[in-house]
Amino acid sequence: MRKLLNMETWSRRDHFHFFSQFEEPFFGITADIDCTIAYDACKARDCSFFLYYLHKSLLAANYIEPFRYRIIDGAVWVYDQVNASPTINRPDGTFGFAYMNFEQDFHLFLINARIEMERVRHTKGLEPAIAGENVIHYSSIPWIHFTAISHARSFAFKD
């Protein structure tokens, strides 16, 4: 579900109109975060760290209302929930796009996410933008150390 944000009473209205004029109105911040304790806990429980941090980031995104905002046809919509659309590696060296519903309960999220990962690993090609507007796109590249990433984006294609 979603609801239209009331632009007349929104404190960020002027900021929205100003930055909406930019071809690329996005900004990003990167930071090093020590996840050693969480990583070690996952490994001790034979739990996927990827799915653990994916769930925790979705938990935070769903808690913070502006992370659930989406701009559609010039209007700001507030979704009740945002979900994940991560890239999933395949045995042939390619990747596919997955869609994972957010669940408060980590174990339920884990069960459903594993099923979706297996589904994507057994497909070929790409299915972009099938997840809808209320997703966060994720890419995990654990084999390199980096402090920033920029994703390819086509502004003419609603994504």
Residue ranges and their predicted role:
Residues 10-15:
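Basic, often amphipathic N-terminal segments
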Residues 60-67:
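Short alpha-helical functional segments enriched in proximate histidine and acidic residues
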Residues 90-146:
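Helical lid/core segments from catalytic subdomains that handle acyl or acyl-like groups
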Residues 2-5, 20-49, 68-82, 135-138, ...:
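Gly/Ser/Thr-rich phosphate-binding loops and adjoining beta-strand/alpha-helix segments
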Residues 67-99, 128:
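Small-residue-rich loop/turn and linker elements
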Residues 152-159:
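Intrinsically disordered, low-complexity linker/assembly segments
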